[in-house]
């Protein structure tokens, strides 16, 4: 990966698009350079405020991706984003429309669900986003309809995916978390003591308690890491599903167009074949001049009219 500099980050942020691939690519670059987390967050906040309103939400998507996916590597980004994230939410919320606030609300819901930040930060984010109004609780049916609408809007880009992009997406899933046999074995081998609260009664001394605490901590880290990888894989598979749907739609449109062209050229072929057949028929009925006597340069004279009509 390229070396980190504030100028390089500014350039990458200026080129950031709303596509999942663009966000994830820059997110990976930032996580790779996580030792520069403080200047990264500073540049991110500065460029966020300079960005056009229709690009501000993408900056929050980037922060979300970095914060969630860097947790496995270390707490740097979660900690360094904390002092600025509330004001960032407030800024984006005030500069954009209700649709954007709806997307911000989804990000906030995920952070609540996954306990990305402490409750006091989450409450400040809610205040920044909703003000004194509490977010309205939605029914299960409303949530499903909302998800379907969101999936449809993301699944109908103006341009279908390139074949190479589709192949790469499929190849990436060959090494997906669900196929990691080694981790499966480690999870399957977790001792029952770390999974059953009822067995805590068997702890009789501090040493055994600390030993079990270490085992539980390791199990939590293993499962949290694997759950994060599975969540990322689910997102990748959803994206691949959309890509395949777009690719299939494009291929169906191309198929219909080519079938129409084929019928058109079949009709042209039929017309040309008919002309050829008729031409051959007419050629057969014409006299063959090559079979006439060659009179050029011969001493043979054509008869005179008087010779033809002379009386005997």
Curated annotation (Swiss-Prot):
GO terms for molecular function: identical protein binding; RNA polymerase II C-terminal domain binding; RNA polymerase II complex binding. The modification N-acetylserine is found at residue 2. It is found in: Nucleus. It comes from the Eukaryota. The modification Phosphoserine is found at residues 153, 156, 285. PANTHER family: CYCLIN-DEPENDENT KINASE INHIBITOR-RELATED PROTEIN, REGULATION OF NUCLEAR PRE-MRNA DOMAIN-CONTAINING PROTEIN 1A. This is Regulation of nuclear pre-mRNA domain-containing protein 1A. The lineage of its organism: Eukaryota, Metazoa, Chordata, Craniata, Vertebrata.
């Amino acid at each position: 990966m390229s070396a980190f500099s504030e100028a390089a980050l500014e350039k990458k942020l200026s080129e950031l698009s709303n596509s999942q691939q663009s966000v994830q690519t820059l997110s990976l670059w930032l996580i790779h350079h996580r030792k520069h987390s403080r200047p990264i967050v500073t540049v991110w906040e500065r460029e966020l405020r300079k960005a056009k309103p229709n690009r501000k939400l993408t900056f929050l998507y980037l922060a979300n991706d970095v914060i969630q996916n860097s947790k496995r590597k270390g707490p740097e980004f979660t900690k360094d984003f904390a002092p600025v994230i509330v004001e960032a939410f407030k800024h984006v919320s005030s500069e954009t429309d209700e649709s954007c606030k709806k997307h911000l609300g989804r990000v906030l819901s995920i952070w609540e669900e996954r306990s990305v930040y402490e409750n006091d930060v989450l409450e400040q984010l809610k205040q920044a986003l909703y003000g004194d109004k509490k977010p309205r609780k939605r029914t299960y049916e409303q949530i499903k309809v909302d998800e379907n609408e969101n999936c449809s809007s993301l699944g109908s880009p103006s341009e279908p995916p390139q074949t190479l992009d589709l192949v790469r997406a499929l190849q990436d899933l060959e090494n997906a978390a669900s196929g990691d046999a080694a981790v499966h074995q480690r999870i399957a081998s977790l001792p029952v003591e770390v999974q059953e609260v009822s067995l805590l009664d068997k702890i009789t001394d501090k040493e055994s308690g600390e030993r079990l605490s270490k085992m539980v901590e390791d199990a939590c880290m293993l499962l949290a890491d694997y759950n994060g990888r599975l969540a990322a894989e689910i997102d990748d598979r959803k994206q691949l599903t959309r890509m395949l749907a777009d690719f299939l739609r494009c291929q169906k449109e191309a198929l219909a167009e080519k079938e129409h062209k084929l019928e058109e050229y079949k009709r042209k072929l039929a017309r040309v074949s008919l002309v050829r057949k008729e031409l051959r028929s007419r050629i057969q009925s014409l006299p063959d001049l090559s079979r006439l006597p060659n009179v050029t340069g011969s001493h043979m004279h054509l008869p005179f009219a008087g010779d033809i009509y002379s009386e005997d």
